[in-house]
Amino acid sequence: MRFLIDECLTVQLVAVAGHAGYEAYHVAHVGKAGWKDWHVMQHAREQDFVLVTNNDVDFRQLYAAQPLHAGLVILIPNVDGEKQQRLFAGALQQLAHHGEPVNQVLEVDLDGENATFYFYDLSLPG
């Protein structure tokens, strides 16, 4: 799996993915900072990236209209970089067991200090 980290999240998530054996890039480091959400999604789809974001409303809506996508990881809470890293590391463990999230979303949330993980399908009906 390859990951594209949205600019709303810390660049340190690239290192978290790398440490777990995955390829990852941050939007700001690939010349895409400031791009509109639909353009980020298009780039992720064209390059077969799983997009990692905490912009759940916009990207969930954009991805739901796509017939095929590599997947979406949403870190729901708006937390500091250290907690983002912890949540993303947990998401990577979940994905290692689950497999590639083609046409799926993995939502990661916090219940107190405990992370919760929820997979669901998200693609154009058809």
Model regions and ranges:
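Acidic, metal-associated active-site segment
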Residues: 35-49
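Acidic, metal-binding active-site segment of PIN/NYN-like and related structure-specific nucleases
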Residues: 48-62
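Acidic, PIN/NYN-like endoribonuclease modules and their adjacent C-terminal/linker elements
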Residues: 1-2, 7, 11, 16-19, ...
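Bulky hydrophobic/aromatic packing residues
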Residues: 13, 26-27, 41
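Short, basic, glycine/proline-bearing loop/turn elements
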Residues: 20-29
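Short beta->alpha connector loops at strand-helix junctions that form conserved
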Residues: 28, 55, 75-77
